């Protein structure tokens, strides 16, 4: 049996309950993170917590504990569940209010931490490669609901996933309102062409923690790299395409909109980055058990 942390208590996950008047439940009014633990270490915990607090600040939600206290709660939840390899979901909701929208009526934010054993999100597709679909639904505009706010309102992402599923894709690819490539339904996107790597700037997509780690690896390996706007033509004519995310890690895309990418197999640069990222997660992180 696994336990969930809920506002100061550890509760069996099958007994964990949220009020029907919690604005996180009613309106998606809250923020969250996705974090990974590998072999007893939490990968980039501080960076994830920094982003959680930035998301909260952006929606004027004050988290009632310090970052250090939040990180310790995450570690304690992992210990409580005796987990070494896990997916971690910290959540902060606006708290209990009424059926109106006014956030001032929510006096006490709710803090929840869920931890689950975790393996490979895409299974054998890391070897075969994913099929992706560019979807008709556009990514939330940065002047409406900025993608860099990791909010509980994920309907935009879910609509993209529904469309990709209906069209036989493993993953969706968003365009923004200007027609530029934004990101996947839950991951950032990279393009390899003639030995160089490009990725969209993060004004129209989430500033991914895994994205930043992969960029560090790219720079360390001396691979030419730049952030620039990417169009559909760049995807269709790429030598390699891959996505990065906490859950996905690095996943190769070999078909987009029915078009084979490169030779239709995970490319050499993508496979090298996957190997280096695996090494990084094995050696870096905050120890859970000390």
UniProtKB/Swiss-Prot annotation:
Residues bearing PTM N6-(pyridoxal phosphate)lysine: 150
Any GO molecular function: L-leucine-2-oxoglutarate transaminase activity
Metabolic or biological pathway, per its Swiss-Prot or TrEMBL entry: Amino-acid biosynthesis; L-isoleucine biosynthesis; L-isoleucine from 2-oxobutanoate: step 4/4; Amino-acid biosynthesis; L-leucine biosynthesis; L-leucine from 3-methyl-2-oxobutanoate: step 4/4; Amino-acid biosynthesis; L-valine biosynthesis; L-valine from pyruvate: step 4/4
Cofactor needs: pyridoxal 5'-phosphate
Any one Gene Ontology BP term: isoleucine biosynthetic process
Cited InterPro entries: Aminotrans_IV, Aminotrans_IV_CS, Aminotransferase-like, B_amino_transI, BCAT-like_C, BCAT-like_N, Class-IV_PLP-Dep_Aminotrnsfr
EC number annotated for this UniProt entry: 2.6.1.42
UniProt catalytic activity: L-leucine + 2-oxoglutarate = 4-methyl-2-oxopentanoate + L-glutamate; L-isoleucine + 2-oxoglutarate = (S)-3-methyl-2-oxopentanoate + L-glutamate; L-valine + 2-oxoglutarate = 3-methyl-2-oxobutanoate + L-glutamate
Similarity comment: family membership: Belongs to the class-IV pyridoxal-phosphate-dependent aminotransferase family.
Name this polypeptide is given: Putative branched-chain-amino-acid aminotransferase
């Amino acid at each position: 049996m696994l336990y969930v942390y809920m506002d100061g208590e550890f509760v069996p996950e099958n007994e964990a309950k949220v009020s029907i008047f919690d604005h996180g439940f009613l309106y998606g009014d809250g923020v969250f993170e996705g974090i990974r633990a590998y072999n007893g270490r939490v990968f980039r915990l501080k960076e994830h917590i920094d982003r959680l607090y930035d998301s909260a600040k952006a929606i004027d939600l004050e988290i009632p504990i310090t970052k250090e206290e939040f990180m310790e709660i995450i570690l304690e939840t992992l210990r409580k569940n005796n987990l070494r390899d896990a997916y971690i979901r910290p959540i902060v909701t606006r708290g209990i209010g009424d059926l109106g929208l006014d956030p001032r009526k929510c006096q006490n934010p709710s803090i929840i931490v869920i931890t689950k054993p975790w393996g490979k999100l895409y299974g054998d597709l890391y070897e075969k490669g994913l099929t992706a679909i560019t979807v008709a639904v556009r990514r939330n505009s940065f002047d409406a609901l900025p993608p860099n706010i990791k909010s509980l309102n994920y309907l935009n992402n879910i609509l993209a996933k529904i469309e990709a599923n209906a069209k036989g894709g493993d993953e969706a690819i968003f365009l923004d309102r200007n027609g530029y490539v934004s990101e996947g339904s839950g991951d950032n996107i990279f393009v390899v062409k003639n030995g160089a790597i490009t990725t969209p700037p993060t004004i129209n997509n989430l500033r991914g923690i895994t994205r930043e780690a992969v960029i560090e690896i790219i720079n360390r390996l001396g691979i030419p790299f730049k952030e620039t706007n990417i169009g559909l033509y760049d995807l269709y004519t790429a030598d390699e395409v891959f996505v990065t995310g906490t859950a996905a890690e690095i996943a190769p895309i070999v078909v987009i909109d029915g078009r084979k990418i490169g030779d239709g197999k995970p490319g050499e640069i993508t496979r090298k980055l996957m190997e280096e990222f695996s090494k990084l997660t094995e050696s870096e992180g905050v120890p859970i058990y000390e």
